[in-house]
């Protein structure tokens, strides 16, 4: 069994917003990946952008500059 790690998740109201964030992050070299929303969370479209908390801290301003609507932003052990 693998050890759980702390991650920062961004959730979205729509699949369109989730895919836009994935494209934006890839185009701008922002680390992370799209994952199915963990069962512990109930939110919008069922997808979340996952990244390490320290990466989110470094990239927060660029993510916010994307103007992509994020439903929730949280840290979670996965």
Describe each region flagged by the PLM.
Residues 9-58:
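Amphipathic, hydrophobic secondary-structure cores in small proteins
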